[in-house]
């Protein structure tokens, strides 16, 4: 449900994004009859049995795969460890570059693939937390080990979802609406648009190259020491360092803060849970 709702809080497609998305959907042959323009961000949820060609693109005449059809939208991979490892590993380059190149006998084609990846997985093969699982530690580690470290490095946020008590499920308390959240997201995107107005290829914090991190993600002494300790204690990679700074910058934007505070950074660090020992 979380993944399906995500597209409802994202900003509307710009005209340029709508045109790019429409072109891809037209090539893939999935435009609805009479549809002239795609106006809503795509949401794609391929099954874990999807082939390399189905997910990345292919066939004799290279057609867009799910990652390109999800361009400017959301790609949801449920039961992530159940996908073929070869398929997941070939997603690393598109996640980094926002495009995918398909080579076939008929020629080579490069399609856009700038999507938001959302993935879900169980903590063990039987779906239970390790302490309650009937699986052996070796089976659990083999299951979790299907997701490589380099792929996890390219996922900005890792969120552990605990069991929800019945009283919370049955509660009638109101929650923040998607419309309200979307307004904050749009305001944050406007801040980022102003930040990168002199860099046409950069539209949001996630696409910020390393050379701009020092300029837009500078830290005062306290946040710097916090990040240093996290990097050393959790043995985080250089790529995780970039991800943490970008997420912290975005959290600061959502609160309309010009600088990254220790609170913003601490929240970003705790989203690297899969970089630590899994569900210890």
Tell where the protein language model's regions lie, with residue ranges:
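Residues immediately C-terminal
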Residues: 75-76, 82-83, 166
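Walker A/P-loop
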Residues: 1-32, 97
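Long, charged amphipathic helices and adjacent flexible linkers at domain junctions
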Residues: 31-45, 185, 199
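Walker B catalytic acidic pair
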Residues: 72, 78-80, 90
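Conserved alpha-helical scaffold flanking the Walker A/P-loop in AAA+ ATPase domains
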Residues: 37-42, 47-75, 108
């Amino acid at each position: 449900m979380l993944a399906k709702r995500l597209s409802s809080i994202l900003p509307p497609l710009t005209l340029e994004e709508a045109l790019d998305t429409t072109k891809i959907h037209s090539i893939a042959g999935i435009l609805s009859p009479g549809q002239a323009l795609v106006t809503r961000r795509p949401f794609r949820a391929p099954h874990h049995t999807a082939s390399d060609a189905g997910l990345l693109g292919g066939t004799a005449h290279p057609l867009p795969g799910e990652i390109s059809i999800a361009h400017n939208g959301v790609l949801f991979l449920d039961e992530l460890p159940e996908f073929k490892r070869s398929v997941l590993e070939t997603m690393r380059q598109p996640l980094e570059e926002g495009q995918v190149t398909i080579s076939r006998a008929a020629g080579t084609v490069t399609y856009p693939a700038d999507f938001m990846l959302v993935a879900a997985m169980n903590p063990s093969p039987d779906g239970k937390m390790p302490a309650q699982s009937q699986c052996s530690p070796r089976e659990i580690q083999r299951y979790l080990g299907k997701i490589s470290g380099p792929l996890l490095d390219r996922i900005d946020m890792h969120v552990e979802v605990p069991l929800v008590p019945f009283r919370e499920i049955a509660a009638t308390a109101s929650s923040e609406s998607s419309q309200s959240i979307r307004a904050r997201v749009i305001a944050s995107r406007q801040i980022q648009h102003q930040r990168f107005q002199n860099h046409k290829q950069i539209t949001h914090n996630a696409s910020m190259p390393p050379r701009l991190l020092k300029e837009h993600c500078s830290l005062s002494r306290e946040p710097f020491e916090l990040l240093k300790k996290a990097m050393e204690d959790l043995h985080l990679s250089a790529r995780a360092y970039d991800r943490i700074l970008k997420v912290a910058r975005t959290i600061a934007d959502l609160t309309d803060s010009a600088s990254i505070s220790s609170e913003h950074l601490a929240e970003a660090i705790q989203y690297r849970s899969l970089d630590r020992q899994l569900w210890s």
